[in-house]
Regions:
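Outer-membrane beta-barrel signature, preferentially recognizing the C-terminal barrel domain
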Residues: 258-277, 392-409, 413-414, 418-472, ...
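Periplasmic-side early beta-strands and strand-to-turn transitions of outer-membrane beta-barrels
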Residues: 134, 150, 158, 178-262
């Protein structure tokens, strides 16, 4: 199959070479202008928070923003330092690709992307696409996810320096500095710490009392910089943190059962992208290197119920891609190829060094004619693992996966449909980890079918989608001889049937502006693994039937008030669907008041936030209580 990658690469080179020699007949050459964004998308369902609407939300991380999207479930393992992952339409977090400026954020070890560590302070937009976004020039990796989240860095529109200080509940202290040069460069640095010792209510058959969350602290600093020049962009990022890992609330509230596990993270990446367009041809290249280091400590001297564990993990990731497209007035042809090298080293007992080579190639055609638009794509994936112990290496994996999208657009109305079949390979943890690995795992497949209608004019946007998902050979962890030994297995079939609705409105009258958006999802996820199992047709854990959100944003002469409401219905914590494992519905209301003062050429911005205004005591994940009402105040001075 290597010949396929060679043909794609050769096609890309031929296209770019031809474009460099093509004449510009009857075309006036103008200076280069950098444009961020894509043309209107009609083919796939999408949701976006951008600009002022994004900054006015009472949110600090990407995970906080995504929870307001239709069909999204955020798994939050409690506490301000807990892991936060995203799940779209119950496909699983490892089927969701997260892209920063068009380049994927990866984790070769377990596939889980912790969205809590990515700040919104320098983001222009956060967008969610079912299937993938409708852009002419995409890398092969962008087609390799069932759903995609795009984080677009904000390009600086002025030369300025700003400093920010914030304080809040549970010992929160935040210091931030931002330096920008118009259209060229920004540097963003942040330090934050919090004790995370919030109160919670604990109820069981034998007690009903109020406790205080322990080991939920986090201290981190982050520094990143991005540069822009014509079609070239570069981004560097470094993140360092120490955090407590708040365990589940079990047995009685005593120090003996409090989790004392600690985790240290060091994350670094540098990436670049270059894009150039000629008359009918366009070319894009991406390059990225990432280094991740993690230490996990479990110390029985601080918790007698645990065993000693002090493990270190190091991951490296090197990625390169090239994409080329030919465009006419009604047809666009794209060819792209990607290559990713990932390795994992650890001091876990009897774990061998392993690295993975992942190559992808894509052929795509998009046609438009009198309001009709269609996209056909074929993705080829080849994955090979290599280990110092050859017996542990799995056989190479090669697959073709298709995608079909179609839409009809007339004035403000759009009718669209898509089908996409994709798979995810088992992670290195799934295959090779000493206690849980299973080298015989098969890839996990998802098939998506979607039919939707969309209406959009200057002020109003309405969308309605009905969808059906099918997940085969789902990779799950099950206990073996004892609770301390688990194994990864392929298990069963999951079917999902859902309906999602979104509505948005925005208007400006002089100095007054108003915007509102609402999302609602009704989704049923059931297990169809075996008719002989007692769990047959049971509801999948953590998949509520109903979920909804509303955001209202008002602005007047430098003042802005944003309120957001989030609702999640009842759901089960286990596949057995026992009443004891039923988690109740919950809802929260957040408020954010902001005022900007102009002082000569400078500005002062004061912000007051209240999260969980109604003091809702709830659990997103069973036995991981979430914070109640909490406050935050921030002051920012911009020079």
């Amino acid at each position: 199959m290597r010949i396929i990658h060679f043909i794609i690469l050769l096609f890309s080179i031929v296209i770019s070479a031809h474009a460099q020699t093509s004449r510009l007949d009857s075309v006036h050459t103008i200076r280069d202008v950098a444009v961020v964004g894509v043309r209107p998308h009609y083919l796939t369902p999408s949701q976006t928070l951008a600009g002022t609407a994004l900054q006015n939300l009472s949110t600090t991380s990407v995970a906080d923003a995504l929870k307001y999207f239709s069909g999204v479930q955020i798994k939050d393992y409690g506490g301000l330092g807990g892991l936060k992952t995203v799940n779209v339409r119950s496909l699983g977090s490892q089927h969701v690709g997260v892209y920063l400026d068009g380049i994927r954020i990866t984790n070769a070890q377990n596939g889980q992307i912790d969205l809590g560590r990515y700040s919104l302070s320098n983001m222009e937009s956060v967008a969610l696409y079912n299937a993938n976004r409708n852009e002419r020039l995409q890398s092969a990796s962008e087609y390799a996810s069932a759903a995609t989240v795009y984080l677009q860095t904000r390009r600086p529109d002025s030369t300025a320096l700003s400093v920010e200080y914030g304080t809040g509940s549970f010992g929160l202290q935040k210091l931030k500095a931002y330096l920008s040069f118009k259209n060229i460069l920004f540097v963003d640095a942040e330090y934050q710490r919090t004790d995370g010792d919030y109160p919670f209510r604990f109820q069981s058959a034998s007690e009903d009392t109020v406790g205080k969350r322990r080991n939920s602290d986090i201290c981190f600093y982050r520094i990143e910089a991005a540069g822009f020049y014509k079609g070239f962009t570069a981004h560097a990022y470094y993140y360092s943190s120490e955090r407590g890992l708040p365990g589940p609330v079990v047995r009685r509230l005593s120090d003996q059962w409090d989790s004392t596990d600690r985790q240290w993270d060091r994350n670094f990446f540098v990436q670049s992208s270059y894009r150039h367009a000629w008359d009918r041809f366009s070319l894009k290249t991406n390059l990225k290197y990432a280094y991740d280091w993690l230490r996990y400590l479990q110390d029985p001297s601080t918790n007698a119920a645990t065993m000693y564990c002090d493990n270190h993990y190091r991951q490296q990731d090197l990625y390169a891609s090239a994409s080329a497209a030919w465009n006419s007035s009604w047809l666009s042809l794209t060819a792209s190829t990607d290559l990713r090298w990932s390795d994992l080293t650890t001091d876990v007992y009897r774990s061998a060094y392993v690295y993975r080579l992942d190559s992808k190639s894509l052929l795509s055609a998009i046609a438009s004619y009198h309001g009709f638009e269609g996209n056909i794509a074929l993705l080829y994936t080849h994955i090979g693992d290599h280990s110092a112990r050859s017996a542990q290496s799995t056989a190479a994996l090669s697959r073709f996966t298709p995608m079909f999208l179609a839409s009809w657009h007339r004035h403000a109305f759009t009718v669209r449909a898509f089908h996409k079949r994709i798979f995810r390979a088992p992670t290195l943890n799934d295959l090779y980890y000493t206690l849980v690995g299973n080298a015989q795992l098969r890839p996990e497949y998802t098939s998506q079918f979607d039919l939707g209608v969309d209406y959009k004019d200057r002020h109003l946007h309405l969308a309605l989608d009905a969808y059906y998902n099918r997940i085969e050979d789902k990779i799950v962890a099950i206990p073996m001889k004892c609770q301390f030994r688990w194994s990864m297995v392929n298990f069963g079939l999951v079917k999902s049937l859902g309906l999602s609705a979104t509505a948005g409105y925005d208007r400006t009258w002089g100095k007054f502006s108003a915007s509102a958006s609402a999302n609602y999802t009704c989704q049923r996820d059931r297990d169809y693994s075996s008719p002989h199992d007692p769990e047959y047709r049971n509801t999948i854990p953590y998949s509520p039937l109903h979920s909804a959100s509303i955001i209202v944003d008002l602005g007047y002469d430098g003042w802005s008030l944003c309120t957001s409401w989030l609702y999640t219905g009842e759901r089960f914590a286990l596949i057995s669907n026992n009443r004891d494992d039923l988690l109740g519905a919950w809802q929260t209301v957040d408020l954010k008041l902001n005022k900007r003062f102009r002082i000569q050429r400078h500005s002062l911005q004061a912000t007051l936030e209240c999260n969980n205004l109604g003091d809702s005591r709830h659990e997103v994940v069973k036995r991981y209580p979430m914070p109640g009402r909490n406050w935050k105040a921030t002051v920012q001075w911009q020079f």
